[in-house]
């Protein structure tokens, strides 16, 4: 197999994957918070993590939009 056609992973690709991971973590942490009925401390921790991860996802999405607006698609 020839190595003359390498796949290039861009920063935008990495940001997109990070955003996808982040949104998935938000859903996971929200579900964990709802499902954790036996430990209020853990449920509150999961809810806090969901909010924190939501902020990360929003920042990543903002960066993705800036890439799109500047033609880095």
Predicted regions and their residues:
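Iron-associated oxidoreductase/ferritin-like identity signal
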Residues: 1-73
């Amino acid at each position: 197999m020839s190595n003359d056609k390498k796949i290039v992973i861009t920063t935008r690709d990495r940001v997109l994957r990070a955003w996808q991971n982040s949104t998935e973590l938000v859903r996971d942490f929200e579900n964990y918070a709802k499902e954790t009925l036996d430990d209020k401390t853990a449920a509150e921790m999961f809810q806090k993590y969901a909010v924190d991860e939501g902020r990360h996802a929003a920042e990543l999405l903002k960066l993705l939009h800036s890439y799109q607006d500047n033609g880095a698609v």
